[in-house]
């Protein structure tokens, strides 16, 4: 938690110093909610030692909690997003005359800061360079695998701040992975990521976000390191009352590790109940 607190403090203090310059500062609650889901996992036995919980989970029903917020600062051509994403899902099974079993289906904490600059503006689009830093970890270890710990930096080009295309980027990636004690590795990759929103009609919004990451080189050989990683979410949110929404969603994760010759996948579909809003802190 000390790492998370330090990251948040470093992100917020510079923003507070610039706020007096007439810039815009918003706290976007992308969603805080619960998801009921049915999960179908393939080749989980091949990924039993992977630190990625989504690839070694059990196929079953579960309930998951989501917390996704972003502090967004805009001034002239600059946009600076500081985001915190957390999710956790766990199912407890207790068959008759058998001990209780616990299966972790989702576990992720992602702290990120993203700075983009609009070199060109046209037809409601902004295009320019983007840089990003992130710390990716978990609440606890998945089974016998260690708790994931990754520092990640991105640099590339981004299309952003559009009514539909909130973010669409192509970047190079550097990762420092210290998940395994004594086996710290550095990795280079290419990443395509997106966050899109479409207002179907009043009170109904379709949204999707995700990424595809292709790893290109590694400093060390670790069998559980991923070669390819795809993650995508699609949601349809319908307003129930005020800022409370409900709707179906689909989530898909597909990846392949260096030491495995088949892909692991995690397909989730279910119903999502969310609180979504935005607070204008500085206008």
What is the meaning of each model-derived region?
Residues 10-18:
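Hydrophobic h-region of N-terminal signal peptides that target proteins for export
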Residues 35-64, 94-101:
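Surface-exposed strand-loop-strand hairpins of Gram-negative outer-membrane beta-barrel proteins
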Residues 63-69, 109-113, 149-155, 188-194, ...:
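Hydrophobic, lipid-facing positions within transmembrane beta-strands of outer-membrane proteins
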Residues 167, 171-239:
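Outer-membrane beta-barrel transmembrane domain signature
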Residues 225-283:
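Predominantly the C-terminal beta-signal and adjacent terminal strand-loop region
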